[in-house]
Amino acid sequence: MTHWIAGEWVAGTGEKLQSHTPYSHELLWQGYSASGEQVDAAVNAARRAFLDWKKRPFAEREQKVLAFAELVKANSEQIAQVIAKETGKPLWETRTEAASIAGKIAISIRAYHERTGETVREAAGNQLVLRHRPLGVMAVFGPYNFPGHLPNGHIVPALLAGNTVVFKPSEQTPWTGEVLMQLWQQAGLPAGVINLVQGSKETGIALAQSRGIDGLLFTGSANTGHLLHRQFAGQPDKMLALEMGGNNPMVISEHYGDLDATVYTIIQSAFISSGQRCTCARRLYVPLGTKGDALLDKLVSVTANLRIDQPFAEPAPFMGPLVSEAAAQVILKAQADLQALGGKSLLEARALHAAFITPAIIDVTAIERLPDDEYFGPLLQVVRYQTLAQAVELANDTRFGLSAGLVSTDDGEWDYFVEHIRAGIVNRNRQLTGASGDAPFGGPGASGNLRPSAFYAADYCAYPMASMEGETTLLPATLSPGVEL
């Protein structure tokens, strides 16, 4: 049974859907996609459940979410292994994701009270009350790179606020979605409060176009997110929260400090998760001169020797495969395209077996107009620069704005950088892929809108209701002109 609709597991009636390991082609999961009628059934079930769920005390909703958190903790190793098999990420990495699923729930609960709770104050003889109310039925679209952690950054705040949910995982990771939905089932949520529909493009279109949803919470590619944005144009009654990707710049100052620490920070920024994090560094700005040369020499040497293997290998790998052979081919084609434009490979990516490829580092300084694309994989573009002002200007030459970073021991350089850079996540002497769960996550431009994360997700899961209240009506001492009683 593939889908969880109205408190029951049902088989799909759409096209066949399968999930294989990206490292051995082993069949992990199979079923049939949800048809348009089944998507409608899930949305209708969520609509019916919303009428009751929104009225339940917060403490009761919180108890169900906390029960889910305990189940995640109890099953964290199984979750980690499922994610590792389905995405190809090393087991050490998926274990941190499994822990994050439960860990961010406490942050979401705190956010509910701090950002969407109820406040009362007195002013000019009136009682001013701020309340928050749920929006209704929320469609949640999950990505494949963090198939457990990122969707729950939407789902948990939505449920706490009193919304109901229809969740569509990525078609690349249906098994992870099913395992997590089984835990929600065990947590005892009433029928219809959360629903699962599996499928690819057609299922996603049916859910996004449903007239019964009140909002859509999306984490995924910029292309899909922009299609959703155009689709929702002219529908201000629907909430649309988009967390998309970035063409993220990382600037290395001549004052970068320790060479090994800097190289390690770059590798963690560019190649962790095989480059399949939306905050990964895509463009590396390196100063001209001997210090920049030394940095690149060491970076190429260390990157060439990164351990690449299947998720459960011993000793543990740093990188696994990409999520699919198709994704690997996209990176290899991007490398070829950049070479054709005049890029010089410092370390050339090579296709291995299955979806494995080696990382690429390519000097693109000579390319007059660098394509503004997100290469979602282990491909790092290097640009040599003369001044920090030039580097920042080049770094800002992108339609995206997700993350950026500066490696520098000079406080004045950091002050200049943080004042002039355009990005939502800006780190100093830290990897670009590091972010706090209780900080805003996202950025301006084509990287999305709002700030989808455990804490700030509370903002788009409820709307504020402002009230001015008094126990009785009041008759002023002086009436408005033209009124006689």
Curated annotation (Swiss-Prot):
Protein's recorded name: N-succinylglutamate 5-semialdehyde dehydrogenase
Claim: RNA-binding is one of the keywords in the record: no
Record pathway: Amino-acid degradation; L-arginine degradation via AST pathway; L-glutamate and succinate from L-arginine: step 4/5
Residue numbers binding NAD(+): 220-225
Entry's family note: Belongs to the aldehyde dehydrogenase family. AstD subfamily.
Gene it is expressed from: astD
Annotated PROSITE patterns: ALDEHYDE_DEHYDR_CYS (PS00070), ALDEHYDE_DEHYDR_GLU (PS00687)
Gene3D superfamilies: Aldehyde Dehydrogenase, Chain A, domain 1, Aldehyde Dehydrogenase, Chain A, domain 2
GO BP terms: arginine catabolic process to glutamate; arginine catabolic process to succinate
One GO molecular-function entry: succinylglutamate-semialdehyde dehydrogenase activity
Listed InterPro entries: Ald_DH/histidinol_DH, Ald_DH_C, Ald_DH_CS_CYS, Ald_DH_CS_GLU, Ald_DH_N, Aldehyde_DH_dom, SuccinylGlu_semiald_DH_AstD
SUPFAM superfamilies to which the protein is assigned, alphabetical: ALDH-like (SSF53720)
Keywords associated with the record: Arginine metabolism, NAD, Oxidoreductase
PANTHER family: ALDEHYDE DEHYDROGENASE-RELATED
Domain of life: Bacteria
Role this protein plays: Catalyzes the NAD-dependent reduction of succinylglutamate semialdehyde into succinylglutamate.
EC nos: 1.2.1.71
Catalytic activity from the UniProt record: N-succinyl-L-glutamate 5-semialdehyde + NAD(+) + H2O = N-succinyl-L-glutamate + NADH + 2 H(+)
Catalytic residues (positions): 243, 278
